[in-house]
Amino acid sequence: RVVRNQTMLAAMHSPGGEAEVALENVRVPAGNLILGEGRGFEIAQGRLGPGRIHHCMRSIGQAQRSLELMARRADTRVAFGKRLADQSSIRQDIAKSWYEIEMARLLTLKAADAMDRVGNRAAKDYIAAIKCVAPQMAQTVTDRAMQVFGGMGLSDDTPVARFFSLNRFLRLADGPDEVHLSQLGKLKVSEYSKSNAAG
């Protein structure tokens, strides 16, 4: 049964928001089981890698769109007698946004390639990295775009505020950044400790 519908970050991402569901006395007929009893988490884990690639590509696209809007706004907006694009700090924010998007894009492509070549389990370090990098990068870029737009950047007149909140949500979806970073750090300590012992 649906306990309640909730919105996340004051936005409705699906009709009625995100539902809190209570499963009580639920039985699945044996013929409807996939893989077998008790293996649902295994199925979910197998889908997380491709799902994370998908979300990261969306984050990159949202950051790219925000960068384009920010650059156009900086080119046309005049404040205190100067175009925003003539301000060094604005140009630096645009440059940083561009290279941060490109870095996240390349890391995401590398993760997808690793998943294709060696499988999700062996590519887990790249998957964990992009899960943290892409939404954080998109949130940073969209924040810069909101700054360039001023109050308009917080409104529905541009998509950047929505992109900001979606990427904040993604930093918690499928586990908080901190959990992924902790696991990635543990993996790398183990990996480098073994390679140092061997060489």
Write out the residue ranges for each language-model feature.
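Alpha-helical transition-metal enzyme core signature, strongest for iron centers
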Residues: I60, Q64-L67, I94-T108, K131-T142, ...
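Conserved catalytic-core motifs characterized by acidic clusters
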Residues: T7, N32-L48, R73-Q87, Q147-R162
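Short alpha-helical scaffolding segments that buttress acidic/His motifs in well-ordered protein cores
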Residues: A44, A111, F164-N167
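Alpha-helix capping/hinge segments and adjacent helical runs
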Residues: R121, A128-G199
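FAD-binding core of flavoproteins
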Residues: R1-E68, R72, D177-G199
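Alpha-helical membrane and juxtamembrane elements of multi-pass inner-membrane transport
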Residues: E42, S88-A95, R121-K124, A128, ...
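C-terminal helix-coil-helix/basic helical segment that borders enzyme active sites and/or dimer interfaces
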Residues: A71-A85, I101-V133, M146-G153
